[in-house]
């Protein structure tokens, strides 16, 4: 029976395996290319400036860059400031 299973098994051909691997690589590249190289430094610089005036948790600052219609880039900055009572 094992001999029959060996000949009847349907293995993926190498072209399909290569195609799947290439799709994974392309998807990873798109994710990494979506964020410009300067964005982490920009986030750090913005956080440093905010911390000069208000003591906040670094996790309370989010910086995102969105691409719209190819040529338009939108920089979104969200800062959650502490309540007035927490500042005292």
Curated annotation (Swiss-Prot):
The keyword Cell division applies. Pfam families: MinE. InterPro entries: MinE, MinE_sf. One of its GO terms (biological process) is cell division. Keywords: Cell cycle, Cell division. Coiled coil: none annotated. The keyword Cell cycle applies. Belongs to the MinE family. Prevents the cell division inhibition by proteins MinC and MinD at internal division sites while permitting inhibition at polar sites. This ensures cell division at the proper site by restricting the formation of a division septum at the midpoint of the long axis of the cell. This is Cell division topological specificity factor. It comes from Escherichia fergusonii (strain ATCC 35469 / DSM 13698 / CCUG 18766 / IAM 14443 / JCM 21226 / LMG 7866 / NBRC 102419 / NCTC 12128 / CDC 0568-73).
